Amino acid sequence: MPELPDITVYLEALERRIWGHELEKVQITSPFLLRTATPPVSSVEGRKVSNLRRLGKRICFGFEDELWLVIHLMIAGRLHWKAETRKSLSTRSSSKFKAQLALFHFDAGTLSLTEAGTQRRASLHLVQGEAGLSSLDRGGVELFTRQKPERKGGQPALGEFIDLTSFSRVLQSENHTLKRALTDPRLFSGIGNAYSDEILWHAQLSPVKLTQKLSDEETARLHAATRDTLIEWVERLRAETGEGFPEKVTAFRTDMATHGRYKEPCPRCGTSVQRIRYAANETNYCPGCQTAGKLLADRALSRLLREDWPKTVEELG
């Protein structure tokens, strides 16, 4: 699922292409995509884009008269840009593995929304004003104070990161595991499965440690790791994208430290990266750096193996 760094780079690429441009036509090709009936989606046609912002993991397109188109890509939704007119584009997806859900025809080109796989989770809402946006807001604190600040060095800065006191207050407002707290949209905005793994690796903290059991030093470490990890990945993705459009958005990157790196060596200590699987998600961590050599129980396998489930890295052989 695209998270804060991915959405940030999407927004910057969109700003260069559609800010101030007219949305001529919205073409919805999936009956499952649009989740609102009023205002009608046709009401944004003929209007110019006057704002772009992130709301959690959603991308918000602002138009005149305070109309907002809000896209949630979920796990497999992706955006694509073609500098072509709508007359020259087909409504068919170019890949049998991706379904085309919608086309947004601007006077400068066409933005398409696709979703891989068979499940249709991506969504589109059209809402009115800040009240409409608030209805989609899960309530998590924004980690960076400004979403569209002054540009610095040709790139928009992310703004000031949340201070340690505020971060700690939100983090410890409920007694959750660190993994759950970082990915809870009611607590923090924009962090998901991938970057939470990277943050916890940088902080050298166990994903199952409880938030209210953290020492002041551990909280400060997590605060710094969250800031540094998100900034680092925004900068990496900016460098990868350049002036183009982000077409390689993925949660699994070869230069990540732990996420998606099961059984590969930790880049810091060399210990094999391990995983905890639950439902459709997987948490990756380094036992050597994060859990003092202890293997965390994988719910499915530990039930199957019972006493044979290894407890430490050494028992893996």
Describe the predicted segments one by one.
Residues 1-134, 288-296, 302-317:
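Acidic, proline/glycine-enriched N-terminal capping motif
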Residues 22-40, 53, 79, 166-317:
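Basic, nucleic-acid-binding surfaces and adjacent catalytic neighborhoods in DNA/RNA-processing proteins
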Residues 69-202, 210-213, 217, 222:
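Phosphate/anion-contacting hairpin/loop surfaces
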